[in-house]
Amino acid sequence: MSVVATATTVETGHAHPSVNRPNLTSVGTIIWLSSELMFFAALFAMYFTLRSVTGPDFWSEKADALNIPFSATNTTILVLSSLTCQLGVFAAERGDVKKLRMWFIVTFVMGAIFIGGQVFEYTELVKHEGISLSSDPYGSAFYLTTGFHGLHVTGGLIAFLLVLGRTYAARRFTHEQATAAIVVSYYWHFVDVVWIGLFATIYLIK
């Protein structure tokens, strides 16, 4: 979504307030996401440092244990959830609270499926491959990078619940609720993009 200042309309009864972007909330969110980007950059740096220290052969051998088709499917679900999230934002900008709820619920379910897939993958790696957080440098790098991302996705799921809860608790859909939906979408798109980078780095580059 573009962060260039544009005006959108949210219909709330007879009033027609506009959501002007960027506003202080949106700008603050973008600044915060910039700091999060630095955090993930540090995780990427750690990953490549451990890989260079242990050697490519060791890393490639460990990476062979990953179930790439399963992870690719899980990744596709997360990426598609970015589309459903954006459809929810478009509904919020139109003041269509029913469509906002529908698309945000779909997004929440897809995000929850992604997290469930990660938990399943962790279980399989620990049980059948012996790869754990403390097993070796590869395990440490794998679980730290994907685990911290999973925590961020979980945070996004909580944010969706809060936005949805406000739409049910309030008597009418307001400017503030539309802004909240937009801000949550910024965060969700961010974690999706970060995961694409992680997936390419961890699962595809050997």
Swiss-Prot record:
The UniProt catalytic activity note for this protein reads: 4 Fe(II)-[cytochrome c] + O2 + 8 H(+)(in) = 4 Fe(III)-[cytochrome c] + 2 H2O + 4 H(+)(out)
Ranges that cross the membrane: 30-50, 72-92, 102-122, 144-164, 182-202
GO (cellular component) term, any one: plasma membrane
- Pfam families per the UniProt record, alphabetical: COX3
Cite the PROSITE patterns for this sequence: COX3
The record's top EC class is translocase
Q: Where in the cell is it found?
A: Cell membrane
* Catalytic activity, EC: 7.1.1.9
Q: Which CDD domains match?
A: Heme_Cu_Oxidase_III_like
- Topology within the bilayer: Multi-pass membrane protein
Q: Record keywords: Membrane included?
A: yes
GO MF terms listed in the record are: cytochrome-c oxidase activity
Record keywords, A-Z: Cell membrane, Membrane, Translocase, Transmembrane, Transmembrane helix
Q: Which GO terms describe its biological process?
A: aerobic electron transport chain; aerobic respiration
What family does the Swiss-Prot or TrEMBL record give for this protein?
A: Belongs to the cytochrome c oxidase subunit 3 family.
This protein's name: Probable cytochrome c oxidase subunit 3
Q: Whose protein is this, by species?
A: Streptomyces coelicolor (strain ATCC BAA-471 / A3(2) / M145)
